């Protein structure tokens, strides 16, 4: 299955049309089975929005995966409406749920480890956090989680070891969970 996790830009216009779509077509990918969106900031959704608007001609998105609806801001609500209008299935993923493809050594899973229900903050703090696993490879994808969401993640006990950390805020100078990263 083909998965896209976030896709946008706050400083490159038409990132979907001029960067994401050409790259996917170059790789021979014409359909995205699951497009995950961690939260509603433009730098995470603008390219996915473009793909949804143009999928009859370009890249098709079969399922748009969003965090729990209680964390949707206006941009995520608009994205869900756009997806539905263009025939894309909408799915929510909650902490503890996962998408799995394949079996045995070929098994790939994307497990949602945050946010837990009832987080008092929204926006970046409520970013969807995913643990990707394929064989012995693991990667933590943090969206832009911060503050209460980051603290909740540590307390949840869901954080596992990972080989690669996709740092929150695109590698900001204020890294997620520095003590946790050192212990992994």
Where are these regions (language model features)?
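Non-globular, low-confidence helical/coil segments that flank catalytic cores
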Residues: 1-184
């Amino acid at each position: 299955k083909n998965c896209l996790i976030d896709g946008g830009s706050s400083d490159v216009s038409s990132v979907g049309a001029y960067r994401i779509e050409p790259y996917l077509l170059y790789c021979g990918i014409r359909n995205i089975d699951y497009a995950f969106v961690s939260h509603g900031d433009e730098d995470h959704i603008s390219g996915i929005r473009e793909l949804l608007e143009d999928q009859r001609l370009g890249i098709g998105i079969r399922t748009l995966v969003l965090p729990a609806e209680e964390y949707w801001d206006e941009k995520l609500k608009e994205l869900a409406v756009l997806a539905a209008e263009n025939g894309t299935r909408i799915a929510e993923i909650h902490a503890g749920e996962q998408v799995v493809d394949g079996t045995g050594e070929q098994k790939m899973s994307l497990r949602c480890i945050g946010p837990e229900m009832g987080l008092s903050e929204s926006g970046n703090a409520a970013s969807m956090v995913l643990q990707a696993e394929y064989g012995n490879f693991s990667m933590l994808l943090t969206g832009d989680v911060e503050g209460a969401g980051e603290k909740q993640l540590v307390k949840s006990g869901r954080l596992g070891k990972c080989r690669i950390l996709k740092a929150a805020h695109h590698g900001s100078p204020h890294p997620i969970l520095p003590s946790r990263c050192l212990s992994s």
